[in-house]
Swiss-Prot record:
This is Myoglobin. Heme b binds at residue 94. The keyword Cytoplasm applies. Disulfide bonds: none annotated. Keywords: Cytoplasm, Heme, Iron, Metal-binding, Muscle protein, Oxidoreductase, Oxygen transport, Phosphoprotein, Transport. GO terms for molecular function: heme binding; metal ion binding; nitrite reductase activity; oxygen binding; oxygen carrier activity; peroxidase activity. It is found in: Cytoplasm, Sarcoplasm. The modification Phosphoserine is found at residue 4.
Length: 154
């Protein structure tokens, strides 16, 4: 399920919008994730106390973590599917240390697409959304494959 060159161009053009404010986009993605799927918040001891969108918006730690998440994802997307080393490292930490189920990766993927569309509607139309969805699915499938190698049933 690879992406065409044209699809990768759409993905990376959209990601260029994220890179103008990685921390801000990351914070919004995490807020969307945590408010839409409150069970995901339980995996983050540092953020469990944040109960409302306003509290999350005011959290510098959440903003920093959003920056970390989207910086890592951006590095993976820029590999255009040739991200084995990056995914292996990420899967090891997410399986062994953080215990993040694959389903949560699907939730955050949906949050990313929602935030990009909300913030950049004219630059993130149906074609770009479809391409990003495919790129994130490729990432999730590769994470799931690594989880299996690691014996993590997430």
């Amino acid at each position: 399920m690879g992406l065409s060159d044209g699809e990768w161009t759409l993905v990376l053009n959209a990601w260029g919008k994220v890179e103008a404010d990685v921390a801000g986009h990351g914070q919004e993605v995490l807020i969307r994730l945590f408010t839409g799927h409150p069970e995901t918040l339980e995996k983050f001891d540092k953020f469990k106390h944040l109960k409302t969108g306003a509290e999350m918006k005011a959290s510098e730690d959440l903003k920093k973590h959003g920056n970390t998440v989207l910086t890592a994802l951006g590095g993976i997307l820029k590999k255009k599917g040739h991200h084995e080393a990056e995914v292996k490292h990420l899967a090891e930490s997410h399986a062994n240390k953080h215990k993040i189920p694959v389903k949560y990766l699907e939730f955050i993927s949906d949050a990313i697409i929602h935030v990009l569309h909300a913030k950049h509607p004219s630059d993130f139309g149906a074609d770009a959304q479809g391409a990003m969805s495919k790129a994130l699915e490729l990432f999730r499938n590769d994470m799931a494959a690594q989880y299996k190698v690691l014996g993590f049933q997430g």
